[in-house]
């Protein structure tokens, strides 16, 4: 956790949540569930260089959780999301500038906490969750991106968060009692810094994707999505288009569209890490 006092890092690692008095009252607090006991980590692909940034790509849904479906029920979100996630992975690996891991590379179910904690356990530098949007209004279309906020930016964002966050319960994994086991720990300013970094990356995604794919007029939205709640990994959820809209569906199932999308994501990622490198270099130069 960059910029977090050693005491707080130690508390986070060992799960102690009783040291609230150790810091001034202006520190941010967060409730973090423990990592799953049997977390299965995926392989890290790309150059064998630990100094290169690691991007974790999460294909939404999977297994017995199909996600949303097309109007004719022939296409499922879980399949389209995985295909797009693979396209982004391949584009990143071809560039050779980052390392990549996927939360799932086949049709399997993962609870939301597993997806998030895979990124944390791998010490990822960026987490991107891939989804397809859906709406009763079949005229709705366009890509959008979500970053974490406890306050949703609008009713649609709130509905999305409610729908996605219920995925574990409706698929037989009831986490409603998890709050009894969590440790309440101080995260200092790390959570806020992570959220700010996530929002900055969302802006880069908008810049790189706007010229090539159709974006919603309100491209960047905020919601309390569980999968984005890693306190130390910048995270975004990318809605690649509406599976409920026939025109968007044709794009989502098109290799050409997937390639444009993957290129835009790759460019945004490269710009993101280039910006971070410049900022770190500038910080070192300012030291006495």
Residue ranges of model-derived segments:
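Catalytic-site microenvironment of enzymes
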Residues: 1-288
């Amino acid at each position: 956790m960059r910029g977090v006092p050693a005491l707080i890092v130690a508390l986070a690692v060992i799960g102690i949540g009783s040291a609230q008095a150790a810091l001034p009252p202006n520190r941010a607090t967060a409730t973090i569930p423990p990592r799953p006991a049997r977390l299965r980590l995926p392989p890290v692909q790309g150059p064998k260089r630990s100094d290169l940034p690691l991007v974790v790509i999460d294909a939404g849904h999977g297994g017995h959780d199909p996600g949303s479906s097309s109007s004719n029920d022939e296409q499922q979100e879980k399949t389209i999301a995985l295909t797009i996630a693979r396209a982004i992975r391949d584009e990143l690996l071809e560039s050779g500038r980052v390392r990549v891991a996927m939360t799932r590379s086949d049709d399997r179910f993962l609870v939301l906490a597993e997806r998030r904690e895979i990124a944390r356990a791998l010490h990822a530098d960026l987490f991107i969750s891939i989804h397809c949007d859906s709406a009763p209004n079949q005229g709705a279309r366009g890509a959008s991106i979500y970053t974490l906020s406890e306050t949703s930016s609008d009713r649609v964002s709130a509905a999305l968060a409610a729908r996605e966050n219920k995925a574990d319960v409706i698929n037989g994994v009831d986490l409603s009692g998890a709050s009894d086991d969590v440790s309440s720990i101080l995260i200092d300013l790390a959570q806020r810094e992570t959220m700010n970094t996530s929002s900055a990356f969302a802006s880069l995604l908008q810049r790189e994707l706007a010229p090539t794919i159709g974006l919603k007029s309100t491209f960047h939205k905020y919601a309390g999505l569980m999968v984005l709640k890693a306190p130390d990994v910048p995270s975004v959820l990318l809605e690649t288009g509406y599976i409920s809209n026939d025109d968007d569906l044709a794009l989502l199932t098109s290799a050409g569209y997937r390639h444009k999308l993957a290129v835009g994501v790759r460019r945004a990622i490269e710009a993101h890490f280039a910006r971070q490198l410049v900022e770190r270099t500038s910080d070192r130069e300012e030291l006495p």
